[in-house]
């Protein structure tokens, strides 16, 4: 037994652990505890980063929804404004067409009135000439009556023309 190398190896192993076991145990457990603390710290950091990432994702989703709502509101306002502008342009075009139509009708009425006045003036001139011819031919037999009627007719002619023109 004392000459067996296995005995001495086992005794050296046991003595080594009895003498240095506590120090080795403290060093190994200290290293393992430090490693566990490091892993725990890394896990806490990862959890914190995950919470931050989730918060950032929620913020980004909220911002995206807010931006989408604003965009839709802007689009609706733009469509309403475009419809209003189109309606206003349509009304302006209708008003312009109505103004042009009224101006054309006014011109037509003015031309009609002018033509009627010209016809009335010409008819009055023809009537006066015809009356003069008739009166002069019929009253040649009696010169006094003819002169009196012609003078009265000529004197009343401007007033009669004014009445017919009005």
Curated annotation (Swiss-Prot):
Annotated GO CC locations: plasma membrane; proton-transporting ATP synthase complex
Keyword set for this entry?
Answer: ATP synthesis, Cell inner membrane, Cell membrane, CF(0), Hydrogen ion transport, Ion transport, Membrane, Transmembrane, Transmembrane helix, Transport
Q: Which organism is it from?
A: Gluconobacter oxydans (strain 621H)
How does the protein's chain sit in the membrane according to the entry?
Answer: Single-pass membrane protein
Give the molecular function GO annotations.
proton-transporting ATP synthase activity, rotational mechanism; proton-transporting ATPase activity, rotational mechanism
GN (gene name): atpF1
Protein name per Swiss-Prot or TrEMBL: ATP synthase subunit b 1
Q: How does it assemble?
A: F-type ATPases have 2 components, F(1) - the catalytic core - and F(0) - the membrane proton channel. F(1) has five subunits: alpha(3), beta(3), gamma(1), delta(1), epsilon(1). F(0) has three main subunits: a(1), b(2) and c(10-14). The alpha and beta chains form an alternating ring which encloses part of the gamma chain. F(1) is attached to F(0) by a central stalk formed by the gamma and epsilon chains, while a peripheral stalk is formed by the delta and b chains.
Function (record text): F(1)F(0) ATP synthase produces ATP from ADP in the presence of a proton or sodium gradient. F-type ATPases consist of two structural domains, F(1) containing the extramembraneous catalytic core and F(0) containing the membrane proton channel, linked together by a central stalk and a peripheral stalk. During catalysis, ATP synthesis in the catalytic domain of F(1) is coupled via a rotary mechanism of the central stalk subunits to proton translocation.
What's a Pfam family this protein contains? ATP-synt_B
Q: Which residue windows are transmembrane per the record?
A: 7-29
Question: What family does this belong to?
Answer: Belongs to the ATPase B chain family.
Q: Where in the cell is it found?
A: Cell inner membrane
Output the InterPro entries linked to this UniProt entry.
ATP_synth_b/b'su_bac/chlpt, ATP_synthase_B_chain
């Amino acid at each position: 037994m004392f000459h067996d190398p296995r005995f001495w190896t086992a005794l050296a192993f046991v003595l080594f652990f009895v003498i240095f076991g506590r120090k080795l145990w403290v060093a190994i457990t200290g290293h393992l505890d430090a490693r566990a603390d490091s892993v725990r710290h890394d896990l806490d950091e990862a959890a914190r980063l995950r919470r931050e990432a989730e918060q950032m994702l929620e913020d980004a989703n909220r911002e995206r929804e807010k931006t989408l709502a604003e965009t839709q509101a802007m689009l609706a306002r733009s469509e309403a404004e475009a419809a209003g502008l189109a309606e206003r342009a349509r009304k302006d075009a209708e008003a312009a067409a109505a103004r042009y139509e009224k101006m054309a009708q006014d011109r037509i009425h003015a031309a009609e009135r002018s033509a009627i006045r010209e016809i009335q003036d010409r008819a009055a001139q023809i009537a006066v000439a015809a009356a003069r011819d008739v009166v002069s031919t019929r009253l040649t037999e009696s010169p006094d009556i003819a002169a009196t009627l012609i003078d009265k007719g000529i004197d009343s002619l401007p007033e009669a023309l004014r009445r017919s023109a009005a």
